[in-house]
UniProtKB/Swiss-Prot annotation:
NCBIfam families membership: PRK05399.1
Membrane-spanning segments: none
Molecular function in Gene Ontology: ATP binding; ATP hydrolysis activity; ATP-dependent DNA damage sensor activity; double-strand/single-strand DNA junction binding; double-stranded DNA binding; mismatched DNA binding
PANTHER family cross-referenced by the UniProt entry: DNA MISMATCH REPAIR PROTEIN MSH3 (PTHR11361:SF122), DNA MISMATCH REPAIR PROTEIN MUTS FAMILY MEMBER (PTHR11361)
Annotated protein name in UniProt: DNA mismatch repair protein msh3
Protein localization: Nucleus
Gene that encodes it: msh3
Keyword DNA damage: yes
SUPFAM superfamilies referenced in this protein's UniProt entry, alphabetically: DNA repair protein MutS, domain I, DNA repair protein MutS, domain III, P-loop containing nucleoside triphosphate hydrolases
GO CC, any one term: nucleus
Family: Belongs to the DNA mismatch repair MutS family. MSH3 subfamily.
Entry function: Component of the post-replicative DNA mismatch repair system (MMR). Heterodimerizes with msh2 to form MutS beta, which binds to DNA mismatches thereby initiating DNA repair. Msh3 provides substrate-binding and substrate specificity to the complex. When bound, the MutS beta heterodimer bends the DNA helix and shields approximately 20 base pairs. Acts mainly to repair insertion-deletion loops (IDLs) from 2 to 13 nucleotides in size, but can also repair base-base and single insertion-deletion mismatches that occur during replication.
SUBUNIT field: Heterodimer consisting of msh2-msh3 (MutS beta). Forms a ternary complex with MutL alpha (mlh1-pms1).
Organism field: Schizosaccharomyces pombe (strain 972 / ATCC 24843)
């Protein structure tokens, strides 16, 4: 195929030409076909059908599997020799030959490697480049925007070695799995080996995906950008089991394991879920995994939800990789785990193995199955050792914190706003003033799971108050320490996986600080010195300058003076001896090179002769062109107008010997460095604890910086009362250029527990109820709240039902989703819950919506008795104030009405006051919003007329239907019989509305 070029104008010609060349052996099948997942990735993410596979203008698009076309838009395949269309037609008509393709040694090596990595992109080190072949080259060219060309039997693409990390990051962020294939021998070592005339040995050095990459950015200082969310690197493994006895109801048991390798976090969970998979949705919202692992045994409903998550993330520019795994039964999974821990902990003894298995057996069977799948998956990347650090298995749920649902996270805009789905305008954007990346991640976890234990909350608030209003040197010292810390959490994972050490260790080597008044601060600060002796010991072995430059050859201070007779140190003795010998050999070669230089000076009669470097070639001899003493056996390297560059045979021999010693020294130094890191890993748990301490301090200081602002107050807590004076919305007051209108609220378990809030559209109803929930989350996370004063109960949950959206992944309409979410709220609410229901029933007809809203509001007040904020556009619900007198009160958002001439029509204009006022608003004034949006006056006039006529005509009929529907719904919600006499009495006020 080499040297051929095509000008294809018809798809049939392309197919025939491709077929002919396959018969001739000019193109290998591996070069032609893309795997299904790869095609899907290219179609979905690059838009190949529109741009990538087009020939010259006016030509038809051809099969995307054919490698005969331009790979990068607006770039042409390089050709060596052209073939005319006539020659192609003649070739097509001729009988195909049966001659097989002759692969080059490098191509054969690629094919051998590819056998074990069919669904993986291979980046193969060849000299100073990394090359891609066949279908890998095609994908790489599309994703990276590099040229793709034929050479011998395969498509080829390449990138320079010094840019490989940048390109690898782009490939894995595209959702691909990439294997880095490196040369295991250098030219210097190859030239001295018995296999010097054979191909370089190449092996897979590492396999990378988005979730298995240990970020090299740890070695670069990265100041946190306030309010920016870091990309999640969680890998989520899911398994479920449909309960046959409850199959019709859609109930299912779900187990999961979530892994974040960069921070060394492993989370397990098991729960019962419904048809909507609302609990699984909540976990997805918390973890935001970049990789999903599941088997074909997963239920169709769960698969549909995961697919919906993948597509949703894709619309936001994030690619989620899906890995299908083999799911074993729990018995075989336990056997696999027993074998795994036995092999990993063989040196630690049977007790350690028993402890690991005891932890595993305490998990639910589905979580055990997920753990087995997760370990099997990570073995491909040599990262399975994470699970040996069993101290950091964490349950998703905790009795000391609440878990906010997906609806709460999204509806309250905790991490992204609902307009453009960016962090700006979210609660996290307001509160994030952290200094470190790991502190920023911890703050995110704090907001996802506010505390429910009063003592823990008060401890945090005490610490925040002291940090906010204590300007002494101790606080400043802590801030200064945190300010320049790298990402220690990721750095520790790199230590554990033997990727790096010095900067992580030096960051931990800090002085302790004297005690604070806060018990939490004292406890945190006192933990820092506990690790200092370990850190100081390790740091004492390093040459700081060489370690910071990552020079492993000269990194250790005492390796040259290492005495084999001393007691064992933290380095390997045999390797140390080998390193000393190699350094001595290098010194001897360099000394001999100096002697040879003196010989050359004498021979050439040039006493100032020195070795020079030409490019990457060392020890060059430069002589003028007029020199007559050049022996014939000298090797000419290059020349200029005035001089020649040579190597003598002796220089070449010594250079080969020197390069061999230097390469062996690098290899031995790498080995001793990894041996050293394995000793450090024994202290991983202690280092991890200190990282947690520093992250906690960072979060507390972040809260302190917010809490010290004017208008923020420390919340107090009560078992029976919610009383906030001049409550404000933390995000709106920052985003708006107008002064925010504060509001008061007073709820009590012994008195009014429910507010029924009505009012005009855009009047601030939703913002008001959201700001109360946000204040509760801030208070229970340990932060001051935006108010003049705040007295709050400690809520065990904050349940939200607001907004409207369908769920096409499980064929659910907007109204069905609305009802299922309402059912979820009703099933989880307790008397200690804050419940927010916003505009329930708007996904169906008006009368059905009214009836459902009435029944749900009645049920929550009659039986659950939560702290309830019920926002509605149905003023008829105000009759429940009489039914639940002293327990429910009606309020509306204040407004002013005025009559304005609207050209030929008259329309009411509304001015919003954003103030909570007692009573029910008789209308929602939706036409006013239409007026503000610029709807033509003729339409507004007609709509006003129709609205008034409809109200007059259907009022009585609606009342009777409404009563029947409410009675039926209440009977469904309650097992008890309905008191119809009381119900009709309560509803008599309906006639007046």
């Amino acid at each position: 195929m080499r040297g051929m070029s095509y000008n294809i104008t018809h798809e049939c010609d392309a197919i025939n030409i491709l077929s002919d060349n396959l018969h001739e052996g000019a193109i290998s099948e591996d070069m032609v076909a893309l795997s299904g997942p790869a095609i899907e990735l290219l179609e979905n993410n690059v838009g190949s059908s529109k741009n990538s596979y087009q020939e010259d203008e006016g030509s038809s698009s051809i099969d995307e599997n054919a490698p005969l076309i331009s790979i990068k838009r607006k770039r042409r395949i390089r050709t060596v020799k052209s073939t005319s269309n006539k020659e192609l037609v003649q070739r097509k008509a001729s009988k195909p030959t049966k001659q097989k393709s002759v692969f080059t040694p490098l191509e054969q090596q690629y094919l051998e490697l590819k056998k074990n990595y069919q669904e993986t992109i291979l980046a193969i080190e060849v000299g100073y480049k990394f090359r891609f072949f066949g279908k890998d080259a095609k994908i790489a060219s599309e994703v990276l925007g590099i040229s793709c060309y034929f050479e011998h039997n395969f498509l080829n693409a390449s990138v320079p070695s010094y840019r490989i990390d940048y390109h690898l990051e782009r490939l894995i962020n595209f959702g691909l799995k990439v294997a880095v294939v490196r040369q295991t021998e250098t030219a210097a070592l190859k030239s001295t080996s018995s296999s010097r005339n054979t191909l370089f040995d190449r092996r897979v050095a590492r396999v990378l995906t988005k979730g298995t990459t240990l970020d090299d950015s740890f070695f670069r200082f990265e100041q946190t950008q306030h309010g920016t969310l870091q990309a999640s690197q969680f890998i989520l493994c899911v398994a479920d089991n449909v309960d046959k006895s409850k199959a019709k109801s859609g109930r299912v048991q779900v187990g999961l394991i979530a892994i974040q390798l960069s921070s060394g976090t492993t989370v397990y969970d098991h729960f019962q879920d419904d048809f909507l998979r609302s609990e699984l949705q909540t976990r997805l919202s918390h973890f935001q995994p970049c990789e999903l692992i599941y088997s074909n045994k997963l239920s169709s409903e769960s698969v549909a939800l995961l697919n919906h998550y993948v597509s949703t993330e894709k619309t936001c520019g994030r690619v989620v990789r899906v890995q299908h795994a083999v799911q074993q039964d729990v018995k075989l999974a336990l056997e696999n785990l027993q074998d795994f821990f036995s092999s990993k902990c063989i040196m630690s003894g049977s007790k350690i193995i028993e402890l690991h298995m005891e932890k595993v057996k305490s998990l639910h069977s589905l979580s055990i199955i997920c753990l087995d799948m997760a370990i099997s998956y990570l073995m491909e990347f040599s990262l399975e050792d994470l699970f040996v650090a069993s101290n950091f298995y964490q349950p998703f749920d905790s009795i000391s914190s609440m878990v906010l649902s997906k609806q709460a996270l999204e509806g309250l805009e905790l991490f992204v706003n609902q307009t453009d789905h960016t962090p700006v305008g979210s609660l996290f954007w307001v509160l994030d003033r952290t200094y470190t990346r790991f502190g920023q991640r911890m703050l995110q976890r704090w907001l996802q799971k506010p505390l429910v234990d009063k003592e823990n909350i008060i401890e945090r608030l005490d610490a925040v108050e002291e940090l906010a209003f204590n300007s002494n040197s101790q606080v400043q010292a802590i801030r200064k320490m945190l300010y320049r810390l790298p990402d220690l959490e990721k750095g520790l994972s790199r230590i554990y996986y033997q990727r790096g050490f010095y900067k992580a260790a030096s960051a931990f080597s800090k002085n302790s600080y004297s005690c604070f008044k806060s018990a939490l601060l004292r406890r945190l600060i006192q933990q820092l010195p506990s690790i200092s002796s370990i850190i100081d010991h390790f740091l004492g072995m390093f040459d700081q300058k060489e370690a910071e430059n990552n020079n492993k050859v000269d990194m250790f201070k005492d390796i040259d003076n290492f005495d084999l007779s001393e007691e064992p140190n933290d380095v390997d003795y045999e390797l140390a001896q080998e390193i000393r010998e190699l350094k001595m050999s290098i010194l001897m070669v360099r000394t001999e090179m100096d002697f040879h230089l003196q010989e050359l000076r004498d021979y050439l009669e040039y006493p100032n002769l020195e070795f020079s470097i030409w490019g990457n070639v060392k020890f060059c001899i430069e002589v003028s062109k007029g020199c007559k003493k050049i022996p014939p056996d000298w090797i000419k390297l290059s020349s200029t107008r005035s001089l020649f560059r040579f190597h003598t045979p002796k220089i070449q021999s010594l250079l080969i010997e020197l390069s061999s010693h230097e390469e062996n020294l690098t290899i031995s130094s790498e080995k001793i460095y990894r041996s050293f890191l394995s000793r450090i890993s024994e202290h991983y748990n202690e280092l991890r604890n200190v990282t947690t301490v520093l992250g906690t301090l960072d979060c507390l200081i972040s809260f302190a910086r917010i809490s010290s602002q004017s208008g923020y107050t420390r919340p107090e807590f009560s078992d029976k009362e919610l009383l906030i004076h001049e409550s404000r919305h933390p995000m709106i007051e920052l985003l708006s250029d107008k002064s925010f209108v504060p509001n008061h609220i007073h709820l009590s378990s012994d008195g009014v527990r429910c507010l029924l809030i009505t009012g005009p559209n855009m009047g601030g109803k939703s913002s008001f109820v959201k700001q109360l929930a946000l204040s509760a989350i801030m208070a229970q996370s340990g932060c001051f709240v935006p108010a003049k004063s705040a007295l709050l109960p400690i809520f065990d949950s904050i349940l939200i039902r607001m907004g409207s959206s369908d769920n096409l992944s499980v064929n659910m309409s907007t109204f069905m989703v609305e009802m299922l979410e309402t059912k979820e709220v009703l099933s989880k609410a307790t008397e200690k819950s804050m419940v927010i229901i916003d505009e329930l029933g708007r996904g169906t007809s008006t009368i059905d919506g009214e009836a459902i809203s009435y029944a749900v509001l009645h049920y929550l007040n009659q039986y659950i008795k939560s702290y309830l904020l019920f926002v509605t556009h149905f003023p008829s619900l105000g009759i429940l104030e009489r039914r639940f007198e002293g327990q429910l009160r009606c309020f509306h958002m204040g407004y002013l009405k005025s009559k304005e001439d609207f050209e030929t029509s008259v329309s009411q204009s509304i001015s919003f006051l954003y103030k909570l006022v007692p009573g029910v608003a008789s209308k929602s004034y939706g036409l006013n919003v239409a007026r503000m949006a610029g709807i033509p006056f003729s339409i507004l006039s007609r709509a006003t007329e129709i609205s008034e006529n409809y109200e007059k005509k259907h009022r009585n009929a609606r009342k009777n239907v409404f009563i029947r529907k409410v009675a039926k719904l209440l009977m469904i919600l309650n097992a008890e019989e309905i008191d119809f006499k009381r119900l009709f009495y309560d509803l008599t006020a309906f006639e007046e509305i």
